[in-house]
A protein has these predicted regions:
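Bacterial extracytoplasmic/cell-wall-associated proteins, especially those involved in peptidoglycan
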Residues: 2-140
Length: 140
């Protein structure tokens, strides 16, 4: 059962985002990017208040995703990535992104905190950061 509302076009949009942000990190990395996106829609907290849909989340400015500025983001959605997007919309969570709202790719080690948000772990090149349950209970 879906944890957020998502039309078929929303699924394709999320699949394109997941591929564009993390294709080099494999399916697991793409699922983690999807977790962050779904959490931003679910959360209604911190930087993501009033983000109520996948398009709102993908195109949020400021605070959105770098991939939307790249031409490869606008390529046709592929079935493989749409299936991954459907999995995260249906509630599949992958550590360290299970409760994360942010990720970035540092040049070195992951910092313990990033803008006062705790590091939940690293997967390949990306570090993930989550709010506290008190600050953002809907992502827990």
């Amino acid at each position: 059962m879906a944890v957020i509302k998502a039309s078929s076009s929303d699924i394709r949009l999320l699949g394109r985002l997941m591929r564009a942000e993390a294709e080099g990190e494999g399916e697991l990395g793409m699922l983690m990017v999807g977790n962050v996106g779904v959490n931003r829609v679910r959360g209604n907290c911190l930087d993501f208040k009033n983000i109520r849909s996948i398009p709102n989340m993908v195109y949020q400015s400021p605070g959105g995703f770098e991939a939307v500025t790249k031409s490869y983001f606008y390529q046709r959605a592929r079935d493989k990535y749409n299936r991954l997007a459907r999995r995260v919309v249906n509630g599949e969570r992958t550590h360290p992104a299970s409760n994360a709202l942010w990720f970035f790719r540092p040049s070195g080690a992951c910092p313990g905190t990033w803008y006062d948000q705790s590091n939940t772990g690293r997967f390949k090149a990306h570090c993930f950061f989550a709010p506290t349950a008190q600050a953002c209970p809907r992502v827990y």
